[in-house]
Swiss-Prot record:
<dbReference type="InterPro" id="IPR036574">
    <property type="entry name" value="Scorpion_toxin-like_sf"/>
</dbReference>
<dbReference type="GO" id="GO:0006952">
    <property type="term" value="P:defense response"/>
</dbReference>
<feature type="disulfide bond">
    <location>
        <begin position="15"/>
        <end position="37"/>
    </location>
</feature>
<feature type="disulfide bond">
    <location>
        <begin position="27"/>
        <end position="44"/>
    </location>
</feature>
<dbReference type="InterPro" id="IPR044062">
    <property type="entry name" value="LCN-type_CS_alpha_beta_dom"/>
</dbReference>
<comment type="function">
    <text>Beta toxins bind voltage-independently at site-4 of sodium channels (Nav) and shift the voltage of activation toward more negative potentials thereby affecting sodium channel activation and promoting spontaneous and repetitive firing.</text>
</comment>
<keyword id="KW-0964">Secreted</keyword>
<dbReference type="InterPro" id="IPR002061">
    <property type="entry name" value="Scorpion_toxinL/defensin"/>
</dbReference>
<feature type="disulfide bond">
    <location>
        <begin position="11"/>
        <end position="61"/>
    </location>
</feature>
<keyword id="KW-0528">Neurotoxin</keyword>
<keyword id="KW-0027">Amidation</keyword>
<dbReference type="InterPro" id="IPR003614">
    <property type="entry name" value="Scorpion_toxin-like"/>
</dbReference>
<keyword id="KW-1015">Disulfide bond</keyword>
<dbReference type="GO" id="GO:0019871">
    <property type="term" value="F:sodium channel inhibitor activity"/>
</dbReference>
<dbReference type="InterPro" id="IPR018218">
    <property type="entry name" value="Scorpion_toxinL"/>
</dbReference>
<feature type="modified residue" description="Cysteine amide">
    <location>
        <position position="61"/>
    </location>
</feature>
<comment type="similarity">
    <text>Belongs to the long (4 C-C) scorpion toxin superfamily. Sodium channel inhibitor family. Beta subfamily.</text>
</comment>
Amino acid sequence: KEGYLMDHEGCKLSCFIRPAGYCGRECAIKKGSEGYCAWPACYCYKLPNHVKVWEYATNRC
């Protein structure tokens, strides 16, 4: 599974003012294989199926 990580409000996890490597660390915490800042939000690859990712259809932000 891949996609944008979400914050506690269900919005994309911002990386706009974060240091280099921030998204990779956040993706690793969620057990993803890798991630990067797809400006302005963190995008992850190979996440476990139980991890919730941002979806356009259910966007509230």
